[in-house]
Amino acid sequence: MADSEALPSLAGDPVAVEALLRAVFGVVVDEAIQKGTSVSQKVCEWKEPEELKQLLDLELRSQGESQKQILERCRAVIRYSVKTGHPRFFNQLFSGLDPHALAGRIITESLNTSQYTYEIAPVFVLMEEEVLRKLRALVGWSSGDGIFCPGGSISNMYAVNLARYQRYPDCKQRGLRTLPPLALFTSKECHYSIQKGAAFLGLGTDSVRVVKADERGKMVPEDLERQIGMAEAEGAVPFLVSATSGTTVLGAFDPLEAIADVCQRHGLWLHVDAAWGGSVLLSQTHRHLLDGIQRADSVAWNPHKLLAAGLQCSALLLQDTSNLLKRCHGSQASYLFQQDKFYDVALDTGDKVVQCGRRVDCLKLWLMWKAQGDQGLERRIDQAFVLARYLVEEMKKREGFELVMEPEFVNVCFWFVPPSLRGKQESPDYHERLSKVAPVLKERMVKEGSMMIGYQPHGTRGNFFRVVVANSALTCADMDFLLNELERLGQDL
């Protein structure tokens, strides 16, 4: 087929299909994987929105394009996308590229099935069951339930819904009008999905009682006890506490044993949002950070974050063995969940979720785990802690780096103090001027494509950087580069 000809439908032409896919895979390997993970290449190729629209030629037209043009489209998509597998990408709680997980993602997309019944996803139903069993065992449960969800936010929302249903099962049929005012409790450092979940589930954000956190970002159990008493005095019914293991900004781990004691005294559902910190359970050295997690009723854990399983890979784990997920979320659609099937219908998982179609998220994690084993994944976690500590110690040797606090996880939070502000901490406008530094440096690094680091204000603190040390390909040289690059970018400030 000539390059100038429009690409016809490939249906029924296996030779053409193979040729196209081999060509596309070649582009992916060259551009997204080899270049996208090389320190000799940029993390991103920044373009302003209008320029990017022109470069991509986004308009969808009546006529198709040639195979040559399609391959150029693929190259352009990769070229102008952020390379999250790059060793200099420190911007989010996910980074890196695991080849076995990527292989699992490719297979998943190729098979294009929905994980709601055993009859159309037999391999993945059994695989998901085994992966969830393994995750529960790491939490400390010998039995239980669980499901893969489309992100940690949904896992957290499911936990709230399950806790409400367990206490008031009539609400599934009769709705909110049957409920008294409810109260749930979480730290001010919690993920924003708790507030969004309360709104989405009809509880309202006023039902979320915000518990104090200490100077390190950990929930204060004494204030939790106080907030529960206040809610009851106001006529609300407490039903859930959401603790956090690995907060988004500071990387704090709530004191789960003390929080579990409070929940036990008051008969409250304990949910642990371990979306970020759950993978620490794989480390014998560091799993003490989650001591008490086995006392939770539910746990959210995102292996797509620290384990780099690839977006998305988010598990909700339950200690419950009463089929609570299906009772709460099920609707028994007769065209999917026939009860007279030729196999054990308990294998059909679709009624555990509020979705109908559900993508397969277990294969990438299973394949990576098969390749790495517990020991390989543990080394990955431990190395992240080692490199985070290396970065902190190197910062202390240099002028111009001020830690927000000593990290206990792999979130390293700090200010870069440029030359013009050094020694001027007592100036009345010092903090205001310091807060303006991170946005300027972020713009410079992104537009050069040298690296990406996130920043944010936090409480009374002005903007500071948060480096996430999670990519298993990182070395001490990458940590040194980060510090050197900040010094270079900020030398004139």
From Swiss-Prot:
Expressed in liver and brain. Also expressed in both astrocytes and neurons, but lower levels are expressed in astrocytes. It comes from the Eukaryota. GO terms for biological process: L-cysteine catabolic process to hypotaurine; L-cysteine catabolic process to taurine; taurine biosynthetic process. It catalyses: L-aspartate + H(+) = beta-alanine + CO2; 3-sulfino-L-alanine + H(+) = hypotaurine + CO2; L-cysteate + H(+) = taurine + CO2. Keywords: Decarboxylase, Lyase, Pyridoxal phosphate. Its EC number is 4.1.1.29, 4.1.1.11. Pfam families: Pyridoxal_deC (PF00282). One of its GO terms (cellular component) is cytoplasm. One of its GO terms (molecular function) is aspartate 1-decarboxylase activity. The modification N6-(pyridoxal phosphate)lysine is found at residue 305. Its cofactor is pyridoxal 5'-phosphate. Pathway: Organosulfur biosynthesis; taurine biosynthesis; hypotaurine from L-cysteine: step 2/2. Catalyzes the decarboxylation of L-aspartate, 3-sulfino-L-alanine (cysteine sulfinic acid), and L-cysteate to beta-alanine, hypotaurine and taurine, respectively. The preferred substrate is 3-sulfino-L-alanine. Does not exhibit any decarboxylation activity toward glutamate. Homodimer. Belongs to the group II decarboxylase family. This is Cysteine sulfinic acid decarboxylase. It comes from Homo sapiens (Human).
